[in-house]
Amino acid sequence: MENETNEKLEIKGIPTHEGKYVEYNVLGNFFEVTSKYIPPIQPVGRGAYGMVCCATNSETKEEVAIKKIGNAFENRIDAKRTLREIKLLSHMDHENIIKIKDIVRPPDREEFNDVYIVYELMDTDLHQIIRSSQALTDDHCQYFLYQLLRGLKYVHSANVLHRDLKPSNLLLNANCDLKICDFGLARTTSEADFMTEYVVTRWYRAPELLLNCTEYTAAIDIWSVGCILMELIKREPLFPGRDYAQQLGLIIALLGSPEDSDLGFLRSDNARKYVKHLPRVPRHPFSQKFPDVSPLALDLAERMLVFDPAKRITVEDALNHPFLISLHEINEEPVCDSPFNFDFEQASLSEDDIKELIWNEALKFDPNTMK
């Protein structure tokens, strides 16, 4: 797959701390990494958290992506998100999940303010591909979906919900290999604080989250996969709601109004009343609304995009669906050896506690003691 070509910048580094570290000025952002990471250093992405640059590990000759999270411990929620991402990705080992290669420790522990996480380098993400003029065949859609489900099967087997699956969190390389990234919102079970913790993209959010359910299951990720599948096919978001109310309206416009038997997951009387008072919309099969789309792809999407989470297809059954028959191989779809332990979330961690835990995670990559 091709990505937009970016003009290369010549970014020179200044050695620091007796040459053990090098500092780069990347578009006004200071990047200080150990000297084993060598140029060319190039910016490859920017987000709310900071900047991502690519570099080469001189010891392994491997190209890597380095994410700098500036002032990582200023805000406890952000710091916990960083810790969660590091712990989860260190626990997981799967071809379709991005790998952490290193955590760059600062030269001085007392000045540990920025976190640099080193990942394997990918070329682009699914959001960029969908937006591009790159032709996408049925084979592309099948292969991307298969890899997403294969990775998600592993995630769910670790008793983890991703909770923020969307095209920009699915990284790709030139071979069309797909890897799930950004586990900062992942949880083992539902938590009420999710609703206020982050303004995550609502377009891929399941009805139970839009309706403030505090109990939800792995089915929330399956809903997101259904949205992503249809976006791959149509090259535009399926439910681009401006706000929660419009988001729910777009869902019902496509799926039809839910029956009473579909609302068992709603514990709140207010939520149930709200849904029941919405204008009634008849249900039409997807094949009527999308007559030019592969019937098998539509059938799978319809099984994912079900209002009642209990009736949504599971990741195992989705992998076994006829749309993916040419790729599905049960013995090549591993599960996680042990469930992920979220116990560290339960403690009321201070910013300094989180800093200590991230420092300890960094030590696992380079146990050589530094002050």
From Swiss-Prot:
Where are the active-site residues found?
Answer: D164
- Does this entry carry the keyword Transferase? yes
Keywords (alphabetical) are:
ATP-binding, Kinase, Nucleotide-binding, Phosphoprotein, Serine/threonine-protein kinase, Transferase
Q: Which residues carry this modification: Phosphotyrosine?
A: Y198
GO MF terms, alphabetically ordered:
ATP binding; MAP kinase activity; protein serine kinase activity; protein serine/threonine kinase activity
Ranges of residues in domain Protein kinase: 38-324
Its activity is regulated as follows: Activated by tyrosine and threonine phosphorylation.
Quote the PTM field: Dually phosphorylated on Thr-196 and Tyr-198, which activates the enzyme. Very low autophosphorylation, although dramatically increased when Mn(2+) is added to the reaction instead of Mg(2+).
**Record's keyword annotation contains Phosphoprotein:** yes
Per the record, its GO cellular-component terms are: cytoplasm; nucleus
Instruction: Give the modified residues of type Phosphothreonine.
Output: T196
Q: Which SMART domains match?
A: S_TKc
- Signal peptide start and end residues: none
Q: Which family is annotated?
A: Belongs to the protein kinase superfamily. CMGC Ser/Thr protein kinase family. MAP kinase subfamily.
Q: What is this protein called?
A: Mitogen-activated protein kinase homolog NTF6
